């Protein structure tokens, strides 16, 4: 990427996953949780009796997904309590230094599945280049004066909004509700991929509907290199993705 920078710098698209938020601290002084940590915290808070929490073995949950645990939590408690809990977990005061560098990349657009507003705070801190325009559904009009920030899973800035208007997409039913909207948003986002360099930062590609669209786009788009940065950058992962 560094050696090819002069050829790519004017055609960048960023795709940020949970790994891009590693190192961030919330207002309670704790690291932002990853998916499995958040699942365990939701299970402890809403499902377990207080007397069970200290000794509970979360391996009992096996491969239970975050959205499944969240669905049960919403049923047992309430949607608002779940939203308040998530807001507390992802409320931050400042972004990391690397988020403050994002505006200087002059990216064409940004896509993130993260709830936090580290990207927004990074742009606000340095006040450089085009401002962001957050997009939560496929009805928002694009404006060349702004950098589109696609956030299909919602944001900490609108914790109590509808899921298609910035609210948290966290339960199984939330995902069902936005399935069509997210598909159209993805199509809008990837329509700009042709001849662009896509950089994935901390994105695991475990979301199969997103990953499948990206995979097919990558096979068609042979004119630019795509790059991926992962917290766990081992040789097996690198070799698996290199030719895909």
Language-model features, listed with the residues they occupy:
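Conserved catalytic-core helix/loop/strand module for nucleotide-ribose chemistry
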Residues: 1-197, 201-244
């Amino acid at each position: 990427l560094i050696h090819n920078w002069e050829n790519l710098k004017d055609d960048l698209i960023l795709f940020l996953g949970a790994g891009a938020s590693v190192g961030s601290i919330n207002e309670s002084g704790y690291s932002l949780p990853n998916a499995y940590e958040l699942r365990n915290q939701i299970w402890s808070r809403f499902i377990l009796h207080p007397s069970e929490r200290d000794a509970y073995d979360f391996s009992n949950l096996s491969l239970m997904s975050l959205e499944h645990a969240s669905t049960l939590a919403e049923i047992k408690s309430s949607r608002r309590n779940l939203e308040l809990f998530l807001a507390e977990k992802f409320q931050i005061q400042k972004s990391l230094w690397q988020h403050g560098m994002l505006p200087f990349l002059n990216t064409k657009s940004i896509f993130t599945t993260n709830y936090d507003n580290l990207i927004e705070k990074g742009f606000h801190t340095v006040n450089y280049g085009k401002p962001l325009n957050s997009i939560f559904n496929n009805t928002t009009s694009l404006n060349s004066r702004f950098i589109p920030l696609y956030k299909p899973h919602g944001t900490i800035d609108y914790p109590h909004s509808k899921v298609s208007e910035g609210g948290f997409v966290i339960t199984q039913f939330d995902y069902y509700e936005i399935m069509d909207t997210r598909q159209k948003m993805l199509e809008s986002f990837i329509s700009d991929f042709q001849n662009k360099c896509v950089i994935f930062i901390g994105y695991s590609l475990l979301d199969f509907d997103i990953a499948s669209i990206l995979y097919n786009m990558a096979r068609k788009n042979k004119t630019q290199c795509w790059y991926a940065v992962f917290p766990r950058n081992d040789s097996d992962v690198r070799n698996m993705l290199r030719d895909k």
